[in-house]
Amino acid sequence: MKETNSFSQKLKQFALLFFPIFVTQMSLFAMSFFDTTMSGHASPIDLAGVAIGTSIWIPVSTGLTGILMATTPIVAQLVGSKKKEDVPHVVIQAVYLAICASFVVILIGLFTVTPILNGMRLEEPVERIAAQFLSIIAIGIIPLFTYTVLRGFIDALGKTRTTMIITLLSLPINVVLNYVLIFGNFGFPKLGGVGAAIASAATYWCILIITVMIIRTKEPFASFNIFKQLYRPSLSSWKEFLKLGVPIGFAIFFETSIFAAVTLMMSNFSTTTIAAHQAAMNFASLLYMTPLSLAMAMTIAVGFEVGAKRYNNAKQYGFIGIGLALAFALLYSILLYFFDDEIASIYTTDIQVHHLAKEFLIFAILFQISDAIATPVQGALRGYKDVNVALIMTLIAYWVIGLPLGYILATYTDWAAKGYWIGLIIGLAFGATFLLIRLFQVQRKYTTQNSRS
């Protein structure tokens, strides 16, 4: 990152931040995408089992990686304020937290996964695949969480192209392992959805190994000497980190778990409905990688400018990110409307699943505008280290408004499973409105301070 003077310079620098992040997020998502699509072509039961497994795994993993994402704004502000010498201590303490969090998640999972799945009253084959999926994916928790911290450090320096290269190097491993293990090619046993979990866990370890090697040997990362000194664990540092990270993590958890909760509630419907819902939700999540990538770029850009006390520049980056997100939302809405049949065909050859997935995809169009506002706005707020109000807003929008309304519509109207999608859409719209108002308040506060000084 460097200081910019004109709007065009900011737009160019933001694009250079965003594009590698976008490729990285798409590549990471591609692992889940290939898990879902390839499992779906194995059988509808495998697709449903992976759907249930990921609906439990994704909120946990994204919520905790969200906590660890606090590395990015902290390091970005340190670099912006020319405090490079403080960076190694922050990163190592975050790595310690990541490892501790990994063991806690694994321990809790040992005692909770089976009761949760038993309580869902799934068909026996679906429950078995979901349980095996979760047991195996746990092997990849430690590398995934540790990589999240190290990626936050790399991205905070504005070197988002590096994380892009790391992920692109790892993606082919995931695809090949999926092909071999899901379908039983080259003499390996046919494992179906369980093979997808093995492939993802192995890929997470590959990503971590590559990242550590780059940080140790390549500039500008090597000059920070991140691994030169293993600092003693510092509870005070953990407390400061968690003060920022926990609201970020829970805000992400509330947003992602609402979709997972809907998937779990879909267990009351048929396997066909679960599979169709998962297919449509998976593609909607694919499109979500764009506003998410814009949000991550905004955290870096806004955090850097706030650290340097250039608050007007930070405000301009906010407008750039939201504007780009709305433009992409329009493009994706057109794509969903005109190519719903082709999109559904990617996920399944089953006629009933295909038809129902097309109906769900139409609802995904309405997700686009809300995501284009809410997600980048949260990225900007993280750059300001303003996270507590966003946490409360997301809780209310998704869990107080969206999910209860969806349940009512699905249970007491003819909308059935589609009622959950309508509830999600309304919850997302409220969340986008609340968060945008908060961003304006924060920007006004900082620009007022700037004018007074």
UniProtKB/Swiss-Prot annotation:
Any matching Pfam family: MatE
Main localisation: membrane
Keyword Cell inner membrane attributed: no
Membrane topology term: Multi-pass membrane protein
GO terms assigned for molecular function: antiporter activity; xenobiotic transmembrane transporter activity
Alphabetical GO biological process terms: monoatomic ion transport
Cellular component per GO, a single term: plasma membrane
CDD domains: MATE_NorM_like (cd13131)
Keywords: Antiport, Cell membrane, Ion transport, Membrane, Transmembrane, Transmembrane helix, Transport
Cellular location(s): Cell membrane
Segments traversing the membrane: 13-34, 49-71, 92-114, 129-151, 164-183, 193-215, 244-266, 286-308, 317-339, 359-381, 388-410, 420-442
Function comment: Multidrug efflux pump.
PANTHER family assigned to the protein according to its UniProt record, in alphabetical order: FMN_FAD EXPORTER YEEO-RELATED (PTHR43298:SF2), MULTIDRUG RESISTANCE PROTEIN NORM-RELATED (PTHR43298)
Family the UniProt entry places it in: Belongs to the multi antimicrobial extrusion (MATE) (TC 2.A.66.1) family.
Name by which UniProt lists this protein: Probable multidrug resistance protein NorM
Origin species: Bacillus thuringiensis subsp. konkukian (strain 97-27)
